[in-house]
């Protein structure tokens, strides 16, 4: 256990800390020596012991035990049984996990056991924690909602299927756990005052189990729980019955799900007689009775996707996903399992090393190849475990830092980093050699077959019966008649267009590629008509056809985005200049950073002469469309959550407002000069106040801009141009010009719909308010609903003096003491008036914004609470957006955390729905039974506060 000199100081520092903490003195010398060694290698071990006094005392005894894994479940069950509440249970789980992980890491770093023993301990620890958490929560849920039963009244358990390395008993040190929840039969609970359906019971139970294991607390977390391998992924139900599970795998199960199901294992399966039924049900899906060579192609496609991901994410030195890494060894084993497992019982093992033994017995690989794979697997898995145990981080990427490299080489008992890299590369090269021989790329034949089918689809586009045959037999689509009709109509419409020889030649080259891309997508029924509509619009512009023909990546992105969103499809059809943005997917899916919109827009406009107002207006619209395309693409790809989508849309709007004000100022000042009061100061003496969605950082894709204009021009000030006018008249002309720039329809459409009716006195008031008049109006004449609007108002453009003036007015007005009952009455009356005017008129539909329990109720409640309590708690005026207003209401003690968090969750869920309905060009109304729980939360809060 010799440490390199560079690591001795790390160890001595850890030992000194341990001595000062007082726990080292009670340890035997052997344990102290071991600690000196492992503390230099693992920050996780050192920090966990230092944080946990009980662990420090128990550690020597723990280290002397050789079979701790055999008692994981009984010890954890006893600890959980003593927990009086959920919080204490969560603490027990996290402490138990961390203590046992220190034990495992300690043994790993000392090489005190084999890799197989280490993986067994890690897997059995995870299984114990999952199963005992389930047992603990099952009892609590039964006490709350009754025991779930079938039609015969028999109690129903929930079975938890461990997938991946957990299922295979080969879990790595800092691994996620992939789970699927299922239960035998439908029915309802018995023994409680009110029965609920088994599906509802098990969904609630599943949510509690995930929370108990996954939630980050003061003590950390147990495991990241990943439920995405369940049927239908994230969009599917959290828990399914056996019958629903069987239907899914028989009718919709995909190749990768077969691949994943090989290692599936029920946690605590010996406790369930129902386990065998589940096993029998799943086996035919995983292992086919015939020899199934299609598995090679499926795994090849999966490997290709992984390779692309490695390139995209720049994952160099990745021992799992890189060429010859752990994943390739797993693929080699699983290709034989999928091809021959239906006939060969020795290939049905979950563990990889046992499967390799079966492969050798059946002489499917040479003994030398199997030996190389086994050696590489053991080496790479040990390297992975030690790498993760250094800081309890989920990583398979070798470190860049010299000291971390030295630690890892030392942990692997190698003299230098260079030696570690050399050995790692030798193992990975041998693996990749076997992988390439067995699964390597074989794209050419398949590619030409696919191309032939799609050439035929285009060449025969006037023969419906032939088209349907190709669609049904070769491409294997459902409802081929619908697709064939769309293709025939498209080709007939093209005949009426004036395409030159070059255009027709490009189109004939392009169309088979289009079909290839469209039918590779699972939602081709949406993608095909949208893509054909776009091509119909651009077919006379050969440049754009050539762009798609010469850039396969652009074509793939076009199909993906059109399939996902009719809004984007329509935008690309209307403004084909945006097709250029599809060439670089990396840029397409990475919106401009929030703080860069202003500078990016300035750079974008800099290429156009300042005095070319028409081109400047066109460029503004193009910039907006490019940015919205990138934001929407990132939204569809799941890169941006709803709050971030709104942030991007809002920062984009603010950048455009700044540019529009600058353009308008240039045009108006060129004619009249500038007001003299701004000559000796920075800025324009002008401000734009954003209300509503732009004020609250909550813009959607189709949002208008609610804005109010202000200036600080004194009376009797004039402009200094050849054509002198009153300063206040100048600001009126400026505002009119701004509105003109926003609303003029150019070749690229309008910029934004602008609404200025929230200004003092509404449509009959001055278009631009002097700051003092704005202040007077808000204090003396404004209605309560105007003060509500002020809650969501902030300056989105303007000089510092105006920012201070607006802030002071807003703060003072919102902090005015108000009669609570009068305020309640006025807010409720305004809400009812809005609902009567704007609420849903469709039977069986819920209007997300305006109906009872919707977004507007949440907004009105936030506004009421700010107006009612700000005189006592002025910090409530700090934010303009609803989420942070509710967070401030918690912080200021106005609203209970549970209630506020429910309202935040309801608000974000409903906004998310509206965002995605915008992408689909759908109205903001949904079926009546959607958001039932969220609407109930909102109604309860509304009734409580407005009682």
Curated annotation (Swiss-Prot):
Keyword list, A-Z: ATP-binding, Magnesium, Multifunctional enzyme, Nucleotide-binding, Nucleotidyltransferase, Transferase
Catalytic activity, reaction form: [glutamine synthetase]-O(4)-(5'-adenylyl)-L-tyrosine + phosphate = [glutamine synthetase]-L-tyrosine + ADP; [glutamine synthetase]-L-tyrosine + ATP = [glutamine synthetase]-O(4)-(5'-adenylyl)-L-tyrosine + diphosphate
InterPro entries attached to this UniProt entry: GlnE, GlnE_rpt_dom, NT_sf, PII_UdlTrfase/GS_AdlTrfase
CC cofactor: Mg(2+)
Record-level Gene Ontology MF annotations: [glutamate-ammonia-ligase] adenylyltransferase activity; [glutamine synthetase]-adenylyl-L-tyrosine phosphorylase activity; ATP binding; magnesium ion binding
Residue ranges, annotated region (Adenylyl transferase): 451-947
Signal peptide residue numbers: none
EC number assigned by the record: 2.7.7.89, 2.7.7.42
Stored CDD domains: NT_GlnE_GlnD_like
SUPFAM superfamilies: Nucleotidyltransferase, Nucleotidyltransferase substrate binding subunit/domain
Pfam families: GlnD_UR_UTase, GlnE
BP GO annotations: regulation of glutamine family amino acid metabolic process
Spans annotated as Adenylyl removase: 1-443
Broadest EC class assigned to this enzyme: transferase
Gene Ontology CC terms, in alphabetical order: cytosol
Stated role: Involved in the regulation of glutamine synthetase GlnA, a key enzyme in the process to assimilate ammonia. When cellular nitrogen levels are high, the C-terminal adenylyl transferase (AT) inactivates GlnA by covalent transfer of an adenylyl group from ATP to specific tyrosine residue of GlnA, thus reducing its activity. Conversely, when nitrogen levels are low, the N-terminal adenylyl removase (AR) activates GlnA by removing the adenylyl group by phosphorolysis, increasing its activity.
Annotated family: Belongs to the GlnE family.
Protein name: Bifunctional glutamine synthetase adenylyltransferase/adenylyl-removing enzyme
């Amino acid at each position: 256990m010799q440490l390199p000199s560079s690591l001795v100081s790390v160890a001595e520092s850890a030992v000194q800390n341990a001595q000062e903490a007082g726990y080292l003195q009670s340890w035997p010398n052997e344990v102290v020596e071991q600690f000196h060694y492992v503390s230099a290698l693992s920050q996780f071990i050192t920090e966990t012991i230092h944080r946990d006094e009980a662990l420090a005392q128990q550690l020597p005894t723990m280290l002397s035990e050789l079979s701790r894994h055999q008692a994981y479940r009984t010890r954890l069950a006893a600890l959980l049984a003593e927990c009086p509440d959920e919080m204490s249970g969560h603490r027990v789980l996290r402490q138990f996990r961390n203590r046992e992980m220190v034990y495992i890491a300690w043994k790993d770093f000392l090489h005190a056991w084999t890799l197989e023993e280490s993986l067994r301990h890690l897997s059995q620890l995870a299984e114990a924690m999952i199963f005992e958490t389930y047992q603990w929560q099952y009892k609590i849920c039964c006490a709350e909602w009754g025991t779930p039963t079938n039609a015969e009244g028999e109690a129903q358990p929930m079975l938890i299927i461990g997938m991946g390395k957990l299922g295979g008993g080969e879990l790595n040190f800092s691994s996620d756990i992939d789970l699927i929840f299922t239960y035998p039969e439908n029915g309802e609970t018995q023994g409680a005052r009110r029965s609920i359906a088994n599906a509802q019971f098990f969904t609630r139970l599943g949510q509690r189990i995930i929370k108990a294991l996954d939630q980050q607390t003061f003590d950390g977390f147990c495991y990241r729980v990943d439920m995405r391998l369940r049927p239908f992924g994230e969009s599917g139900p959290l828990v399914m019955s056996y019958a629903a599970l069987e239907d899914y795998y028989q009718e919709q199960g995909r190749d990768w799900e077969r691949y994943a199901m090989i290692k599936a294992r029920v946690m605590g399966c010996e406790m369930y007689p129902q386990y065998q039924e589940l096993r029998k049900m799943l086996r035919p899906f995983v292992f086919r009775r015939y020899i199934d060579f299609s598995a090679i192609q499926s795994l090849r496609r999966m490997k290709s996707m992984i390779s692309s991901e490695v390139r995209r994410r720049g994952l160099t030195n990745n021992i799992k996903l890189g060429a010859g890494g752990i994943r390739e060894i797993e693929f080699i084993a699983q290709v034989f399992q999928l091809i021959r497992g239906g006939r060969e019982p020795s290939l049905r093992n979950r563990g990889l090393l046992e499967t390799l033994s079966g492969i050798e017995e059946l002489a499917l690989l040479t003994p030398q190849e199997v030996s190389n794979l086994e050696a590489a697997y053991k080496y790479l898995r040990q390297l992975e475990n030690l790498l993760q145990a250094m800081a309890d981080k989920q990583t398979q990427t070798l470190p860049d830092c010299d000291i971390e490299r030295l630690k890892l080489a030392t942990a692997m008992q190698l003299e230098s980093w260079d030696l570690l890299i050399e050995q790692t590369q030798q193992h990975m090269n041998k693996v990749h050699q076997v992988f390439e021989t067995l699964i390597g790329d074989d794209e050419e034949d398949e590619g030409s077959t696919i191309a032939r089918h799609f050439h035929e689809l285009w060449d025969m586009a006037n023969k419906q019966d032939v088209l349907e045959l190709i669609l049904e037999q070769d491409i294997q689509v459902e409802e081929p008649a619908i697709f064939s009709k769309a293709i025939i109509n498209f080709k007939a419409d093209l005949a009426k267009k004036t395409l030159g020889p070059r255009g027709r030649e490009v189109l004939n080259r392009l169309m088979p590629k289009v079909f290839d891309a469209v039918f590779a997508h699972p939602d081709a029924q949406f993608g095909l008509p949208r893509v054909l509509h776009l091509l119909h619009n651009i077919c006379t512009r050969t440049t754009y056809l050539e762009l798609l023909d010469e850039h396969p990546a652009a074509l793939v992105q076009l199909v993906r985005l059109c399939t996902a969103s009719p809004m984007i499809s329509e935008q690309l059809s209307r403004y084909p200049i945006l097709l250029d943005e599809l060439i670089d997917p990396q840029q397409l899916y990475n919106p401009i950073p929030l703080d860069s919109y202003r500078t990016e827009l300035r750079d974008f406009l800099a290429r156009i002469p300042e005095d070319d107002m028409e081109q400047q207006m066109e460029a503004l619209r193009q910039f907006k469309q490019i940015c919205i395309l990138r934001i929407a693409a990132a939204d569809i790809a799941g890169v941006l959550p709803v709050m971030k989508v709104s942030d991007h849309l809002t920062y984009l709007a603010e950048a455009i407002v700044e540019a529009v004000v600058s353009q308008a100022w240039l045009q108006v000042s060129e004619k009249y000069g500038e007001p003299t009061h701004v000559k000796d100061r920075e800025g324009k003496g002008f401000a734009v106040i954003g209300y509503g969605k732009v004020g609250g950082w909550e813009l959607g894709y189709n949002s208008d801009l609610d804005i109010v204009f202000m200036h600080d021009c004194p009376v009797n000030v004039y402009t200094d141009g050849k054509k002198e006018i009153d300063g206040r008249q100048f600001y009126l002309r400026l505002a009119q010009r701004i509105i003109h720039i926003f609303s003029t329809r150019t070749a690229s459409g309008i910029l934004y719909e602008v609404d200025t009716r929230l200004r003092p006195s509404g449509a009959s008031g001055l278009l631009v308010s002097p700051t003092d008049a704005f202040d007077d109006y808000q204090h003396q004449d404004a209605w309560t609903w105007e003060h509500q609007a002020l809650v969501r108002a902030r300056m989105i453009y303007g000089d510092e003096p105006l920012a201070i003036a607006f802030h002071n007015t807003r703060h003072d007005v919102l902090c005015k003491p108000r009669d609570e009952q009068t305020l309640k009455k006025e807010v409720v009356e305004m809400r009812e008036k809005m609902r009567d005017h704007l609420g849903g008129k469709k039977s069986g539909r819920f209007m997300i914004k305006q109906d009872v329990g919707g977004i507007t109720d949440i907004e009105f409640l936030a506004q009421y609470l700010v107006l009612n309590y700000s005189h006592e708690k002025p910090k409530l005026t700090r934010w303009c957006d609803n989420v942070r207003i509710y967070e401030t209401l918690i912080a200021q003690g106005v609203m209970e955390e549970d209630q506020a968090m429910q309202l935040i969750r309801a608000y974000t869920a409903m906004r998310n729905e509206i965002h995605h309905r915008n992408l689909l060009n759908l109205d903001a109304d949904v079926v009546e039974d959607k958001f039932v729980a969220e609407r109930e939360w909102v109604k309860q809060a509304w009734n409580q506060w407005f009682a």
